[in-house]
Amino acid sequence: MKDIPAEILMAPASAVGAADKNWTAVFADLVKARLTALVLATTLVGFYLGWRGAMDFALMFHMLAATALVASGAAALNQLLEREYDAKMRRTQDRPLPSGRLQPATVMLFGSACATVGLIYLALVVNLLTSIVGAVTLLAYLFIYTPLKRVTWLNTNIGAVPGALPALMGWTAARGDLGNGGWALFAIVAFWQIPHFMAIAWMYREEYARAGFKMLPVVDPAGRRTGKQSVSHTLALLAVSLAPFIFKLAGPVYLAGALVLGVGYLFCAVQFSRQLTLARARWLFLASILYLPLLLALMVWDKVK
């Protein structure tokens, strides 16, 4: 998953002055704690839906611990690569590197160690396939998505791939294969990200422009393509969200809830596309952060045994 602006979530760590931050807060900023938590949530749902029979809680724990290490390492290394650009944006200038609370060498060592240990952990304790998917996620996030942010507006669409792969990792950890259910979860998280990040990019387009990031709202100041991307991907999401029911992973309660949530999310995207204001971008963003956890909760609640 790509970074979520801290100041538009409740109780943001970055709202506190750098001088007042303790090392726990510094660590939380470095590993992008909220983003890592979301990664773990999608991974956990993938594992739960993929698992058959009595739950293996030990394996679940190992999967989550290893995934947390990989996600934390990816977050730290991403900040290392973007430290000069983070310093130019108000919402990121208080991160550990641009604020001077950590040195690049420290972050490099920490991030590399976490990512490497996490991938080895997955391979040895979970399974090799999950480790491979984790490695693809890490490399695509750091060396494809991250540099593309300064090259093309398509970075958001391309970045949705590593952002959605943790859901597939959960499935592979449970089943040991790349089955239809895993790809369905991947597609849901991938399509969900586009309107979510279009709303964020619209709200922060001036900061992105100042930092040199070519987000779609930066290169499309009128917002026509931004609105179309939001609506088209929300429509696609509404369709793919039916897949867990079609593949007999979730039941009719999930189906009904997915339709209601999807229509609500689509409504917010359409309203945003019709009038690209800050207020409607915020509504779309809020709809997105409600949609995904509620949809995942419905999957868990109405899993077909």
Regions found by a protein language model. Give the residues of each.
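Interfacial loop-to-transmembrane junctions
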Residues: 225, 266-294
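Helix-coil boundary and interhelical linker segments in multi-pass alpha-helical membrane proteins
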Residues: 48-65, 117-132, 167-190, 240-253, ...
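Transmembrane alpha-helical segments that form the membrane-embedded catalytic/substrate-channel core
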Residues: 69-76, 139-147, 188-205, 238, ...
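Cytosolic, membrane-interface loops and tails of multi-pass inner-membrane proteins
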Residues: 5-22, 81-102, 198-226
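Intramembrane alpha-helical segments
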Residues: 104-174
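Membrane-embedded alpha-helical segments that form the functional core of polytopic membrane enzymes
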Residues: 41-83, 91, 115, 132-143, ...
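Multi-pass membrane catalytic core of lipid/isoprenoid biosynthesis enzymes
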Residues: 83, 91-131, 221-245
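The first (N-terminal) embedded transmembrane alpha-helix
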Residues: 32-49, 161
